[in-house]
Amino acid sequence: MQIPDPSSFRHRMDVQLRFNDVDVLGHVNNTQYFSYYDMGKAHYFGDVRGKAMDWQRVDRIIANIECSYFAPIVFGEDIEVLTRCRHVGNKSFVILQMLREKNTGQVKSVCETVMVGYDPDTKLSVAISDEMRRQFHDYEGWSDPNGEE
């Protein structure tokens, strides 16, 4: 996975490292990265949609997630998670994220998540709503209605 240009991300969120995130090797355990990415996605969707996520009515689920690690995160570093939507298809969209050290800009990892529109009543995939498509478009400032890249 290539390292994207950090300037292409509008959404940034500080990550609070916890002592328990660190393993016996002295760095943040790789499984914790997904917690950081999940928090970044939750805040991103809140900003994109203009409201907090309704946990009683989930309208998207993860179909695939892939993470590439480039450098370890160590306790005491100032880490931020950058998040953006890369593409919107008919029933799915792609979220691109990056963890990096704020002071040096060193990229720690990059994550790509494919999310699918979901109806919790039927438990089936559904098309991405026009409203969500418009919200991504407006937030990301796309000229192409399906995203960039």
Regions found by a protein language model. Give the residues of each.
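Catalytic strand-loop segment that frames the active site of acyl-thioester-processing enzymes
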Residues: M1-H43
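HotDog/MaoC-like acyl-thioester-processing domains
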Residues: M1-M13, Y69, I73-F75, R86-E149
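Short histidine-centered beta-strand/loop micro-motifs
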Residues: V24-H27, A71-P72, E77
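Residue-level recognition of specific faces of alpha-helices
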Residues: Y33-Y36, I61, V114
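Membrane-helix exit/interface motif
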Residues: V48-R49
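Short, basic/aromatic beta-hairpin or loop at an interaction surface
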Residues: M53-R60
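Short structured motifs
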Residues: A63-Y69, E80-L82, I95
